[in-house]
Every structure is written in C-alpha cells, then in structure tokens.
Amino acid sequence: LPEENTFDTSPYSILVVDDNPDLTDFLKKSLGEYFKRVVIASDGVEALQLTRNHAPDIIVSDVMMPRMNGYELCKGIKEDLAVSHIPIILLTARDDKESQLSGYKNGADAYLTKPFEIEMLMEIIRNRLKNRESIKKRYLNTGLVPAPEESTFSQADETFLLKLNKIIQEHLDSSNLDVTFI
C-alpha cells in the first residue's frame, strides 16, 4: 500500500465556491477540521474579489454558477499575476471530456466530479499544497530564478519571470541591482 499523505493543511486557508448552500455548509464543516480558515463564496464574482483581497492558499470551486462560472473564475485568477499561483480544484457534476478539458485550458489544477468523497478531495488538496511548498523551498534554498520554460504554471507566471529575467540581465552590471530595485 502507498504511504499515507501526512501533509499538514492546518496552517492554510481555503476558499470554497458554490451556489448550493447545502454543499458549502457541508464543505465548511468537513474542511474546517483540516484548515486554519474556510471562506465561502456563492459565485465566481464574489470568489474573485475574495481571492484578490485575501489570497487563500487553495480554491475549490463549482463550475456551474450564476454571474461567473468556475471556468471564468479559473481564467480570471490565472491571468492575475498577484494570485495566479493559487491552485484551483474544480468540482462539478459534468464528467465529460470536453468539460474537463475546458477546466484545464482555463487554468484548473485538478478536476473532481460530483458526487465525491471528502477523503479524495483532501488528498488532491494535500498534493497541490505539498507541491507548492516543495517548489517554494527549492527556489528559496537555491536562490535561483527559474527559467520560464522549465517550470511555468500559468501565462501570468511566465510573463512575470520573463520580465524579471530581462530586468536582471539589463542591470546586471549596475550597483543598484538589489531586491528593492527589482
């Protein structure tokens, strides 16, 4: 049997987005024991605003919602440099390949069909958060800025890294090149 994933999610916050109050109540209660904070949004517009204001560590969202659906939410988050690093898991009753492909094309990190088990959702969440932490540690320990084509996760990430690399290359000889300058 594979080793159990023991990644601790208790220091993290999660944003749950769904227009079904019964499901959000269930998820808030179920996920509350695993997370420091569980925030609820009833549609993509509210979720995008909460994400920009509070930057949750991970987002779990329904696809079919009023005002802004889950695909549009993914796209909005992944195009915003300030929050594009936040993993998004889509939950939906739509299990056809076209729906899944649309989710991934718009930036979803994972796609889970309803009905689902909390244990399955938690494993996906743990894996995504653990991967993010591993990437952070790798770059903090090495001090290297990754080349965009090696480890880009979104278009916004790639744009940021290209701009950062260009600034560093253009000012490499400058005595003013430091963190404040960048």
How does the language model describe each region?
Residues 116-125, 137:
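C-terminal output helix
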Residues 65:
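Receiver (REC) domain active-site loop signature in two-component systems and cognate sites
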Residues 35-42, 50:
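Short hydrophobic/Thr-rich beta-strand motif most characteristic of the beta2 strand and flanking loop
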Residues 54-60:
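Active-site beta3 strand of CheY-like receiver
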Residues 25-33:
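Charged docking surfaces used in two-component/phosphorelay signaling
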